Structures are given as structure tokens and as C-alpha cells.
Amino acid sequence: MNYEELLAFAGRNPMLSAALVGLTVALIVTEIRRLFRGYKGIKPAELTQLMNAGGAVVVDLSASGDFEKGHIAGSRNAQASAFGPEHKLVANAKQSPVVLVCRSGNASETAAKALKKAGFEKVSVLEGGIPAWQQADLPLVKGRN
């Protein structure tokens, strides 16, 4: 397809062309924002490797009731509304890997931005949260610990 044919197609299909341009711009903006957000999104398999290597602080920002119903082994619970860089779970972990987990990803992303702003170097968010962990057929433990 040459340039003239492309222009002719766009002229015959303005809605389709506008949708293509809009989606392309949205994709570019999303990727640029992801690159500059300051923290890393990791998949369940990456979190498993990080936990097995030791030293990672995994903080589950789910409500305490949801945490007790099922959480990643070794994770600690903190209420999203009370969590910040000074929280006792992460206060001494500025150089350690900190992985934030929640049910939807929203609370984790907000907390990750705050930690990065406070100087934490290795902040990650579990992409897809607990549902992604379950979808990867990885176990959850019940109870408080």
C-alpha cells in the first residue's frame, strides 16, 4: 500500500482512521507513562524468584479480612490508607526490594509512587495483584500470618 492509497482509504473511512490514530496515541502515552513511573511491574513468576532469593519485603495492602482469606506466603499486611514510607514494614528497607501487592493494583501503584518519591530504590508492584497470582496457580495461605 502506497501513500496515495493510504490517504484514499483514510478519506473513505474517517471514523476507522480516527479510531486507529486515537488508539495509537493512547498506546504511546500509556507506554511512556509506564516507562517513567519509577517503579517496576513484576509477574507472579518474577515475585516467586525474588522471594526465593531472599531479602524481598512483600507488603499486601489488601483489607485485613481479604488478607486472612488468602495471601502470599511471607507477605505482611498493611492497610493501604495507613501505609507510607515511614511504615514499620518498610522503614528500614530503602535498599531492599519492596514488592507491593493488593487485589486490584490501584492501592499498590499509589503506595509505590509514594515509596519511590521517598527514595526507595527497588520498588515493584505485582501486576494483576492477587488474582494474577491465583491465575498462575500459585498458592495462597489463609489466616493472619
Where is each model-derived feature located?
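Rhodanese-like catalytic fold shared by cysteine-dependent sulfurtransferases
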Residues: 1-41, 50-56, 64-97, 106-145
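Active-site flanking residues adjacent to catalytic metal/cofactor-binding acidic residues
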Residues: 59
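Short cysteine clusters
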Residues: 102
